[in-house]
Amino acid sequence: MSHSTKRGDGSSHAALNTEHNETSPNGEISPDGIDRRGFLKCMAWAGTGLVWTFAGGVPVSRVFGQRMHSAKQSDFSFVQISDSHIGFNKAANADVTATLQAALDKIEALPHPPDFLIHTGDLTHSSKPAEFDTLDQMLGKKRQVFYVPGEHDTSVDDGKMYLDRYGKGSQGNGWYSFDQHGVHFIGLVNVVQLEGMGRLGQPQLDWLKKDLTGLKSSVPVVLFAHIPLWAVYPTWGWGTSDSEQAFAMLKRFVSVTVLNGHIHQVMQKVEGNISFHTATSTAFPQPAPGSAPSPGPMKVPADKLRDVLGITEVSFVVQRHTLAIVDASLSGALIQPGSAA
């Protein structure tokens, strides 16, 4: 998305921060770095990733690699990919189709194939028919894919081409919901008629209120949209101006998970009953919030590129109200700082 005059579709790969000063309710440092007393500071994680487990609404974190013993017993799983930017061919990554293919190969190699994929936007870089065609050919028909658009998918025609391809059964500019194994998923669109930051708009908020009506508060809810629904860095437009209206509707639910893309870096926050998570890109990294004059594609050494690109695997154990999120880089190596493009 863009902040006033700048497009902020980029992603920061986030400077590695391994020292968390968050505290437990009694004021002591908790082993998972979570301040359970209130609003969490934004936490950036490296490509080795972090596993979030939600047991009874209480978040517990594990470093990627410390897989849950119950993983084989999960009810179902899905994978989030984001910001493939098909058509981009500049210095930050001259072959985005190759890195997307690497991500898809990584998904195929998972020990337990996911039930479906979620793509959180910026499928293409320029909304060109050939770019959409390439993406469709690469994702193929092996499993179901749920999409939401990024601003790069709507920049030419306000998303008409995107809706013609991926909007069947959706409402408005492409929002919709569905249910899987007792979990309610909601795809939101916050990239149309941008006003400095992401925006949902009143028609979509009215639809969301109706969609949530009748759901029991015990039903796990997963929202996914392109631009972060939380204020990651408003100076760069990395947030959604009217998201608080949506969150007010979600307070009654025991477990709410929000998945976003757009900033091309893994960042997490827990606030009350809501867990926020942004994903890496499969195309290119971007600078950490505030670390450069503006967001944009960031060039890193060629042998480090796949360290800062990746996928997100999500598993659910519904009866235990448990959710686990695992971020994996394409190489499996630690994310390293890079230089601005």
Predicted regions and their residues:
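Surface-exposed cleft-lining segments at the edges of enzyme active sites
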Residues: 90, 191-199, 230-235
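N-terminal secretory signal peptides and thylakoid transit peptides that target proteins
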Residues: 22-54
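N-terminal active-site segment of His-dependent metallophosphoesterases
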Residues: 34, 42, 49-52, 59-133
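C-terminal/domain-terminus segments
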Residues: 325-341
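N-terminal secretory signal peptides
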Residues: 1-35
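Short acidic, glycine-rich surface-loop motifs adjacent to enzyme active sites
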Residues: 217-232
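Active-site neighborhood of phospho(di)ester-bond hydrolases with catalytic His/Asp-centered motifs
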Residues: 81-82, 117-121, 146-151, 224-225, ...
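Extended active-site neighborhood of metal-dependent phosphoesterases/phosphodiesterases
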Residues: 64, 70, 128-220, 242-257, ...
